[in-house]
Regions:
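Basic, flexible linker segments flanking DNA-binding modules
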Residues: 1-59, 161, 215-226
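Active-site beta-loop-alpha junctions of metal-dependent nucleic acid enzymes
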Residues: 80, 98-123, 139
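Short helix-terminating capping/connector loops at secondary-structure junctions
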Residues: 10, 123-126
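Hydrophobic (often cysteine-bearing) scaffold residues that line and stabilize catalytic clefts
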Residues: 13, 47, 84, 105, ...
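An active-site-proximal beta-strand-loop segment
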Residues: 52, 56-96, 102
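RNase H-like two-metal-ion nuclease catalytic core shared by retroviral integrases
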Residues: 37-41, 132-134, 140-144, 154-176, ...
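Mobile genetic element proteins and their domesticated derivatives, centered on retroelements
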Residues: 1, 17, 21, 51, ...
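C-terminal domain-tail junction helix/linker
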Residues: 148-152, 174-270
């Protein structure tokens, strides 16, 4: 192609041609195939979706979980994947459990769950729901038994619609396309270190429109429905249904400790 269109009587060799392509940014970017992280054809027992109309009003009422992949480059053209398991508190938007693994084995989601469970150690009267897709990891006996041993109710998506687990899907997107954007990893240890830093930033420094521009760490000090600068599709649908049924509005949050809204007292809307 180069010889035909540009070289005339001055052809170049392969290596020089590659150097020119690289110098001017003309190399075609290798398209990474996306692995499938959810296998819902496993035949294991699943659970119904019990959070369709539920909006949490305090921490540790609803946890949402999902798994996503991160690419590891072995050389310029060869890559493998590792897998990030996340658990998010749906009220605070805080990542409370995570694990990185080289495979999709249940071991790694269980590690993330065990990390999250430290948040409720010693607490009584837990009224907590764990929501996930119907993947084999979340339906496995090891994962299900661990939830049941801690008195946590289990909810799973009933279709393949991403909106059924939209909050967990959204944090996956934030992690990969914002917090880790532009990073190129060559080993799993580098991934683990970068994810740890990203999660600390996400939880403690990054304000969220969905929790009134608080950080998740600040939202964890609140009780009651937090005002939102942005409302998800799911929550809009729930609110529309509540309005149609004439369900009263909830109280504003009580937030404890330091933060932009510390000391706010609950006010019942007229």
């Amino acid at each position: 192609m180069y010889r035909r269109d540009f070289a005339g009587n001055d052809p170049i060799g392969r290596d020089q041609f590659v150097d020119i392509i690289n110098e001017y940014g003309l190399k075609v970017r290798l398209k990474v195939r996306k692995p499938r992280t959810t296998d819902s054809t496993h035949g294991l027992p699943t659970f119904p979706n019990i959070v369709k109309g539920f909006i949490p009003t305090a921490p540790n009422q609803l946890w949402v979980s999902d798994i996503t992949y991160i690419t590891i480059w072995l050389d310029e053209y060869t890559y493998i994947f590792c897998y990030l398991s996340l658990i998010l508190d749906a009220y605070t938007e805080e990542i409370i459990g995570w694990s990185i693994g080289p495979t999709l084995e249940t071991t790694y989601p269980v590690e993330a769950l065990r990390m999250a469970l430290t948040r409720i150690e010693g607490m009584s009267n837990i009224n907590l729901i764990h929501h996930s897709d119907r993947g084999c990891q979340y339906a496995s006996s090891e994962y299900v038994i661990l939830l049941q041993e801690h008195g946590i109710r289990i909810s799973m998506t009933e279709t393949g619609d991403p909106k059924d687990n939209a909050q967990a899907e959204r944090i996956n997107n934030t992690m990969k396309n914002e917090l880790l954007k532009g990073m190129r990893f060559t080993n799993i240890d580098d991934v683990r270190a970068a994810v740890g830093r990203a999660i600390y930033f996400y939880n403690n420094e990054r304000p969220h429109m969905s929790i009134d521009m608080k950080t998740p760490a600040e939202a964890a000090l609140c009780v009651g429905e937090i005002p939102k600068c942005w409302i998800s599709y799911r929550e809009n649908a729930i609110r529309a249904n509540q309005t149609a049924l004439d369900i009263p509005e909830k109280t504003l949050p009580l937030c404890i400790g330091q933060g932009a809204h510390s000391g706010l007292r609950p006010i019942v809307n007229p």
